[in-house]
Amino acid sequence: MTKKRHLFTSESVTEGHPDKICDQISDSILDAILSKDANARVACETTVTTGLVLVAGEITTSTYVDIPKIVRETIQGIGYTRAKYGFDAETCAVLTSIDEQSADIAMGVDQALEAREGQMTDAEIEAIGAGDQGLMFGFACNETQELMPLPISLAHKLARRLTEVRKNDTLSYLRPDGKTQVTVEYDENGKPVRVDTIVISTQHHPDVTWEEIDRDLKEHVIKAVVPAELIDGETKFFINPTGRFVIGGPQGDAGLTGRKIIVDTYGGYARHGGGAFSGKDATKVDRSAAYAARYVAKNIVAAGLAEKAEVQLAYAIGVAQPVSISVDTFGTGKVSEDVLVELVRNNFDLRPAGIIKMLDLRRPIYKQTAAYGHFGRTDVDLSWERTDKAAALKEQAGL
């Protein structure tokens, strides 16, 4: 059956989006704790609404951090600094409700099942079981230099640029909340050939006209980010299509940690196990194993073993070894998927403690991931984005 040309769409949001405010607060608290206590257990959830922030969750640590102070500093950094924006770092109420991690969970994480049964084979790796059951996916493809799908890559770049021109006063009438969406057309071979549609919605000062916003965003945001060769006379632009976006941020919509999991990953291009990232320390496989799966997939593609690769990992609570590892190359693999799974097992330690050690995840590195995506980042140095295993994989595959 002949493949047809098709469209695929992904979206991103700015750091001022209500859900992203929550992700950044949760990860700022996590970073503050990890900077003083690398072995802390953190599961920190945030919700925001008009004039109110609630931080709740389970945190077990030997240190103290000033949560309200961290909350206010994070909100200020995003740009909610005036009451007329509907949300103000100085005047919003901050409520906290923090418990310790459940002793039942801690028991399984502190000493993994294999250690309790004397089956741990690697003495170097401390016995840490998975903090929960679950399945995680990692993905990579050769559509972009950073080995990410083009739609989410462009959507993130537009969202980041929207924030940039607001903060550097190029477009001083912009306010923090905003969303971007990019539709890419793929040819019969599944290769991206053009941008079909761009949607940008941005919060703004009440006195600016739609015509001004439309002109400025095309000039200072879209042209600055999207390669000219991807845009043609048929490309459609929808800039603030409702005509007005003054009420935004937590005043416009309540926000919650972990509600932008597709924005955080691959824009819907790959499957998702359902677990969110922000506010969780690395013993939570929702986060660490998703990072590891991306690391594996990216190295497979970087090694030339496939044009695209999706890796699934799955865990049982309290058990260190993954219960399953699978690799799907969508027919683009240079070797069989069975061979790839064997290569993955031989080159990557995918036990929770192995992942933490391999990717050095006990550091305060998480706030920078809480907006504009956790993968394909070129602006920050993230260990799971390295391709340092590619040469070994290629050699062992005999290519």
From Swiss-Prot:
Annotated ATP binding sites: 17, 177-179, 244-245, 253, 259-260, 276, 280
Cofactor(s), names only, from the UniProt record: Mg(2+); K(+)
Record: residues binding K(+): 45
GO biological process: one-carbon metabolic process; S-adenosylmethionine biosynthetic process
Keyword Transit peptide on entry: no
InterPro entries for this protein: ADOMET_SYNTHASE_CS, S-AdoMet_synt_C, S-AdoMet_synt_central, S-AdoMet_synt_N, S-AdoMet_synthetase, S-AdoMet_synthetase_sfam
Pathway linked to the protein: Amino-acid biosynthesis; S-adenosyl-L-methionine biosynthesis; S-adenosyl-L-methionine from L-methionine: step 1/1
Cofactor binding note of this UniProt entry: Binds 2 divalent ions per subunit. Binds 1 potassium ion per subunit.
Keyword annotations of the record: ATP-binding, Cytoplasm, Magnesium, Metal-binding, Nucleotide-binding, One-carbon metabolism, Potassium, Transferase
Residues annotated to bind L-methionine: 58, 101, 253, 284
EC number: 2.5.1.6
Gene3D superfamilies listed in its UniProt record: 3.30.300.10
Binding site for Mg(2+): 19
Catalysed reactions listed for this entry: L-methionine + ATP + H2O = S-adenosyl-L-methionine + phosphate + diphosphate
Main location: cytoplasm
GO cellular component, one term: cytoplasm
Entry GO MF terms: ATP binding; magnesium ion binding; methionine adenosyltransferase activity
Annotated region described as Flexible loop, given as residue ranges: 101-111
Protein's cellular compartments: Cytoplasm
Superkingdom of origin: Bacteria
Annotated transmembrane regions: none
Family of this protein: Belongs to the AdoMet synthase family.
Task of the protein: Catalyzes the formation of S-adenosylmethionine (AdoMet) from methionine and ATP. The overall synthetic reaction is composed of two sequential steps, AdoMet formation and the subsequent tripolyphosphate hydrolysis which occurs prior to release of AdoMet from the enzyme.
Subunit structure: Homotetramer; dimer of dimers.
PANTHER family: S-ADENOSYLMETHIONINE SYNTHETASE
Protein name (database record): S-adenosylmethionine synthase
Taxon lineage: Bacteria, Bacillati, Bacillota, Bacilli, Bacillales
Annotated gene: metK
